[in-house]
Amino acid sequence: MPLFDLKSPYPPAGDQPQAIEALTKSLKNNNHYQTLVGVTGSGKTYTMANIIAQTNKPALIMSHNKTLCAQLYSEFKAFFPHNRVEYFISHFDYYQPESYIPRRDLFIEKDSSINDDLERLRLSATTSLLGYDDVIVIASVSANYGLGNPEEYLKVMEKIKVGEKRAYKSFLLKLVEMGYSRNEVVFDRGSFRATGECVDIFPAYNDAEFIRIEFFGDEIERIAVFDALEKNEIKRLDSVMLYAASQFAVGSERLNLAIKSIEDELALRLKFFKEQDKMLEYNRLKQRTEHDLEMISATGVCKGIENYARHFTGKAPNETPFCLFDYLGIFEREFLVIVDESHVSLPQFGGMYAGDMSRKSVLVEYGFRLPSALDNRPLKFDEFIHKNCQFLFVSATPNKLELELSKKNVAEQIIRPTGLLDPKFEVRDSDKQVQDLFDEIKLVVARGERVLITTLTKKMAEELCKYYAEWGLKARYMHSEIDAIERNHIIRSLRLKEFDILIGINLLREGLDLPEVSLVAIMDADKEGFLRSETSLIQTMGRAARNANGKVLLYAKKITQSMQKAFEITSYRRAKQEEFNKIHNITPKTVTRALEEELKLRDDEIRIAKALKKDKMPKSEREKIIKELDKKMRECTKNLDFEEAMRLRDEIAQLRTL
């Protein structure tokens, strides 16, 4: 029986049918690795969706940054509205890991800020994987970091049935063991409240509904689901599955084993420091670890509990830690891993382990942590790439690694469903690049189209932006210090024609889906290096491939080897696309992609609240607006529009102070 229900108004077109068929066949033949080489705008995401639907396996889609993850999440939610599409990225808004600098004798405490919504989405992903098969998880590099033991997580979950016998007090204790906290005042995610014989539980993985369990003596009489905002009953249930409030939750038996294991390791390490006559490290480790043990014994958690993860999961020293892959592969289930933009993602995954190990080794050496802290780590690259699953690498410019691993299992997707061609390109002398480009920009802007310019330095981007602004052009620049939310805002503003020219350094390559852009300019294209490599040039040139007037200008004094290879590949693709269009009588058309409604207009609720004199508003009216804003805020959070959600949250807070 099919697991996935793929919805799309269009059938596969261009090169999509043959790519879907070839890669699905390869996967069904149990090949471990395969690669999709797909040009920009060829519909790689739709091809991925079709492959998932046809292979009928849970899937993990990994990307190298949060912006692309959010984009993929939105697209797959639309493709699979009736399936469980989940989102799993880092839950930290801010993260400063603990570290020690010996030469300065400086210990830096861990400092972090957890995003409650991202934490909920992570929990939703793991609970879906443990309860269902029709799951697609969109994940960042976070998928490679350690999690709790999924089998222990299953032991902690509870199935609650109407009519079953349960002692009321022991049920409350079980909720605490599952990581829920009792709070009669602030009732939100991961908490419960008990009044009389009624227990309300707010699941940690759901912010829209809470569960009410009604007892009659020691028997469960009624189970109901309530809307968290309206507080009205949605439905009654005969039974409900309740999952733990944390991925690291363990039962009391495992907790006691972990405490004993930590104590044993501490004794061995203290003996080592004593024999080495390192009494400073001895006392430091003894004090810190014994304090943590007291907290774990009393509450089940402590600050930095992740450093003891190996003891809680039951793993041996140096053994591969549990991670999201183990939740996908629970019950020996087969699953598919798709690595999007693999030419960037795989090198990023490969560099994670070394940096983490370097920092923690110093902490262990100087007595800040037990050696087991080294086992709370991301996967090594070999562990990742040899996971017991199937891999599909997706990129317009795959590296040698992907192609070697995939051998003959490589599919090309060069023909676009829209008939669009790879852009024309032209090399011009870099001596007068600024003025020459100025003349080209005026022509593009006059047509109502946009321009992307990539430079080698932040300073040049700033100066170029300032220069063109002085000449009356609307330009902005983007650099690495701009966060993801502001980056999205800039891209949206470009599409809305609030400005016409976007200038950047390394931010214009992957994932920019901008059909309004018809001109891409690459300054100093002959300066060999990472930013002007064959891969980077092809990716950057591809940004002009979503517009029928797409054109690339490369400013240089000479043609480098990287430029020559990029030109050969682009010319090969363009020739193949032109031939296909001629045979099938296709006229290239610019991609049309609707701007999201919320980008054009502020929410009506916000405008109303701001227009009214809130301090004179009747309380009942104010409460009504708060309720509407709160509902909208939750919808924005669910759609990963955190910027709008934060704005709504602030509006609600302001109204509540009146």
Curated annotation (Swiss-Prot):
Enumerate the spans annotated as Helicase C-terminal domain. 433-607
Subcellular location per UniProt equals: Cytoplasm
Record-linked InterPro entries: Helicase/UvrB_N (IPR006935), Helicase_ATP-bd (IPR014001), Helicase_C-like (IPR001650), P-loop_NTPase (IPR027417), UVR_dom (IPR001943), UVR_dom_sf (IPR036876), UvrB (IPR004807), UvrB_inter (IPR041471)
Short sequence motif Beta-hairpin: positions:
91-114
Q: Which UniProt keywords apply?
A: ATP-binding, Cytoplasm, DNA damage, DNA excision, DNA repair, Excision nuclease, Nucleotide-binding, SOS response
What biological-process terms (Gene Ontology) are attached?
nucleotide-excision repair, DNA damage recognition; SOS response
Major location (coarse) = cytoplasm
**CDD domains from the UniProt entry:** DEXHc_UvrB (cd17916), SF2_C_UvrB (cd18790)
* Domain spans labelled UVR: 623-658
Assembly behavior: Forms a heterotetramer with UvrA during the search for lesions. Interacts with UvrC in an incision complex.
Name this polypeptide is given: UvrABC system protein B
- Quick one: which gene encodes this? uvrB
